[in-house]
């Protein structure tokens, strides 16, 4: 074959173009657009090159293009695994470097100072834990005992009182006219009292209540009538 014939054959091979339906055919099972593959790989390769790890890669951008375009495989899973491995290598290298600097006495104080500063800043950024609401446990209301429940105007009511704490002036009588009357207390033992209350003769008959002041709670009562009880 002459040189002219070979030249014409090469020109024919170079000028052969695939039909449109073959040239643009893409694996329908793949969601990846292979028309953007070269551009995407160039961006990722540029990012890897910034880290300086490109010298250790067993391939270059041209090889990647040939592999993924030929096999019609999406490159993202492989690139993500590659980036993950590079991050792990970087972290391991950083830890080894820090250990080495800590073992070297001239650089040890500076490294410790930097680590302490970082930890302190992270501690400041932590959100303060919400304080638990303190619940104040109130003492139980005093217990009372009244021998009689029906009285007449002018009678004296005797009330036996037992309490967990010193009740002081925390008990009073509330009349039907909404008047408050103090109870005379006689201490008979530890947190035990005898309460005396003389019903005013100018009051009205009705229901009288014994009120525990801190909780404004009725803990007992008695009935007053306008007829003298038979002795």
Curated annotation (Swiss-Prot):
Presence of the UniProt keyword Transmembrane in the record: yes
UniProt entry keywords in alphabetical sequence: Membrane, Transmembrane, Transmembrane helix
Membrane-spanning intervals of the chain: 86-106
Main location: membrane
GO cellular component: membrane
Membrane topology type: Single-pass membrane protein
Subcellular location: Membrane
Superkingdom of origin: Archaea
Protein name (database record): Uncharacterized protein MJ1293
């Amino acid at each position: 074959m002459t040189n002219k014939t070979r030249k014409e054959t090469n020109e024919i091979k170079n000028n052969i173009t695939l039909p449109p339906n073959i040239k643009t055919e893409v694996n329908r099972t793949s969601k990846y657009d292979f028309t953007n593959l070269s551009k995407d790989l160039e961006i990722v390769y540029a990012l890897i090159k910034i880290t300086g790890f490109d010298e250790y890669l067993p391939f270059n951008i041209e090889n990647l293009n040939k592999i993924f375009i030929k096999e019609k495989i999406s490159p993202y899973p492989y690139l993500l695994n590659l980036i993950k491995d590079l991050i792990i290598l970087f972290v391991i290298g950083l830890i080894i470097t820090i250990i080495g600097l800590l073992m070297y006495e001239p650089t040890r104080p500076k490294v410790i100072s930097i680590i302490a500063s970082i930890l302190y800043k992270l501690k400041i950024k932590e959100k303060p834990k919400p304080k638990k609401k303190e619940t104040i446990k109130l003492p139980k209301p005093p217990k009372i005992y009244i021998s009689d429940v029906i009285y007449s105007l002018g009678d004296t009511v005797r009330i036996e009182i037992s309490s967990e704490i010193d009740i002081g002036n925390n008990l009073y009588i509330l009349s039907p006219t909404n008047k408050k009357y103090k109870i005379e207390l006689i201490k008979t033992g530890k947190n035990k009292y005898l309460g005396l209350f003389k019903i005013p003769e100018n009051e009205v008959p009705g229901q009288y209540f014994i009120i525990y002041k801190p909780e404004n709670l009725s803990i007992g009562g008695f009935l007053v009538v306008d007829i003298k009880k038979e002795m």
